[in-house]
Amino acid sequence: MVTNKKDTDENRDVQGSIVTKTSAIFPVLVGFRVINSLLTRTYFQADEFWQSLEPAHYKAFGYGELTWEWKVGLRSYAFPMLFEIIYRLVKLLAIASKEALSIICSIGAGLMLLCFPQSKLATEVARDLLTIPNEYSETVEYYGVIYAPKLFMALLAATGEYFTIKLIQKVYLKTVSKNDDQLPKLSNITKIALLLTLTNFFNCFFITRTFINSFEMILTSIALYNWDWSGGIEINTRSFTKSLFFAMFACIQRPSNAIIWIVLGFFLTINLLLRRDYTLIGRLYAKILVVFTITMLVNVVIDFYFYNQIIFPVFKFINFNFTSILSEFYGVAPWHFHLLQSLPIMLGYSLPLFIYGLFSNDSTTKNNIRFGALRQIKFVLILNIIFYSYLKHKEFRFIYPLQPLFCLLSALGALKLAGKVQNYRYLKEYVWIIPLMSMIVSIFITTFQESGVIQVMKDLHNEKDIDSVGFVMPCHSTPWQSYLHRNDIRQLWAISCEPPLHLLGKNNASIELQTYMDESDYLYENISGFIKKNFPKFTNSMDMENVNNNASMPQFPHEWPQFLIIFEQLDNEFMSRYLLDSGYVKYNKIFNSYSHWDSRRNGDLIIYYKNN
């Protein structure tokens, strides 16, 4: 096929217009998300830490804890490896700062002793100067461990939103009527898209958190922008090659992402078939094969680095989450969960705009292709929602990779609606109220709601001379070494919740799964019985050392720790009475949440202390 020169020129005009209108947006996005990330100091779900920061910390610093997924090779290491790199850079910075300060402080101490050789004060000052490098280096390393991943995620988040806005511009320019005055409306839709993405409640709450779903959304937004929306004209371009790479990389990390690209690939193939361009179809699938091979090899190398063997976590992920019933171990939601809960929460105040954009007639399609960009996007969204609704285990974040397309239809809906609403200038004076309220709510939740489980790990890091710490609460209720960052604690443990992996492949797995209980289940089914069975009994004559270290006593799964950390719900229900005369005292109480969907996590965090 000979590419139409007019079509090619139009594509170049589209790219030029997009560059012009987005040149100043990226710094705004970065600045906004940096503030967003630094304000985020609350807990949402365990995967934010245990599937990204914890394996990275384990690899970079040589200590920590890995969940069962990493022990059986269910997860790809590609996303955590980014944070390992960040951690290693932090280590280098800490070492460099220590060396630089050591030289400076040594010179200062030497001069002090040289000038005042008989002074006790000078000797003490010189001694104190020599301790500064170690203390400063440890401080630099700890703050780097906490905040460097946040800043990195802010940069990634801004990148994802930047390409989302460019995608919206690109699709808009490819679908508007040729008779429209494009540039004024392009400016308007750019402003609308920027407003929608920055003030979206779920974006502010979620996008800078270290979830694989955030990374998946960012990869998806880059791939969608570089996708061939022209019906085949751009297949031979570098841009389309980039799209394939980022799309396939996203699919390897999260196989469910493939639904997006199967639909788009189907429409691209159909458009080429309708034009009878069989040569280009051959080139398309040849390029797909080559890019897939390269992408898979890159990921295999990354996973080999972590697992020390050639492994394909993507297949184990599919087996556990899609072809077995074990994913239901983590909860089952009704079929309408995403329709009635995920979409309203993810879209927020832009939900009416999205619905309007979804059901609006498609604009005139350029390049005379049968299935235009908007029609394809609507199919992608509908089929993905159907697919995710079919899965029994559902979470809001599973559909987060669709956020660029949600934003696209919302922005187009807002642009169309703005032209039809009367007294628009009057409404314009008040339209900022709803986005502002959305941001206020998100700031409150990211700053306060469930902040205690993060703060307690920071407090433990700063505590001196810790012998042992135990968390008696639902499993993975806190981060681990990614916030504690200490390798000098003799015993550090928490209640576990291992899934029944022995049921994989069993015919009666669905029946046995219903009766399976993990350690957390046993704890809350019978708190008194669990404590008495798994911990040594207190007696008035015993101190902590006798209870935990007497070899003649029967051994228990858990020992009573120096620091015992529980939720207020457990304290009120059992622990406050049981620990009377045990030697434990309430050491601290940290605010965690005003209310919680999980009653086991209600209230503040209670820290008990007993000196060994």
Curated annotation (Swiss-Prot):
Query: In the Enzyme Commission scheme, what number(s) does this protein have?
Result: 2.4.1.-
What domain of life is recorded for the organism?
A: Eukaryota
Location comes to: Endoplasmic reticulum membrane
Q: Write out the GO biological process terms.
A: GPI anchor biosynthetic process
One term of GO molecular function: alpha-1,2-mannosyltransferase activity
Task: Write the record's keywords in alphabetical order, separated by commas.
Answer: Endoplasmic reticulum, Glycoprotein, Glycosyltransferase, GPI-anchor biosynthesis, Membrane, Transferase, Transmembrane, Transmembrane helix
Q: Coiled coil where?
A: none
Signal sequence interval, chain numbering = none
Metabolic or biological pathway, per its Swiss-Prot or TrEMBL entry:
Glycolipid biosynthesis; glycosylphosphatidylinositol-anchor biosynthesis
Instruction: Report how it sits in the membrane.
Output: Multi-pass membrane protein
| Pfam families, per the entry | Glyco_transf_22
Mind naming one GO cellular-component term on file for this protein? endoplasmic reticulum membrane
> Where mainly found?
endoplasmic reticulum
Which residue ranges run through the membrane? Answer: 92-112, 145-165, 192-212, 254-274, 288-308, 339-359, 371-391, 398-418, 429-449
Question: Which positions are glycosylated?
Answer: N188, N321, N361, N508, N526, N550
Function in brief:
Mannosyltransferase involved in glycosylphosphatidylinositol-anchor biosynthesis. Transfers the third mannose to Man2-GlcN-acyl-PI during GPI precursor assembly.
The family database entries (PANTHER family) matched by this protein are listed as: GLYCOSYLTRANSFERASE (PTHR22760), GPI MANNOSYLTRANSFERASE 3 (PTHR22760:SF4)
Q: Which family does it belong to?
A: Belongs to the glycosyltransferase 22 family. PIGB subfamily.
Q: What is this protein called?
A: GPI mannosyltransferase 3
Q: Which organism is it from?
A: Candida glabrata (strain ATCC 2001 / BCRC 20586 / JCM 3761 / NBRC 0622 / NRRL Y-65 / CBS 138) (Yeast)
Gene it is expressed from: GPI10
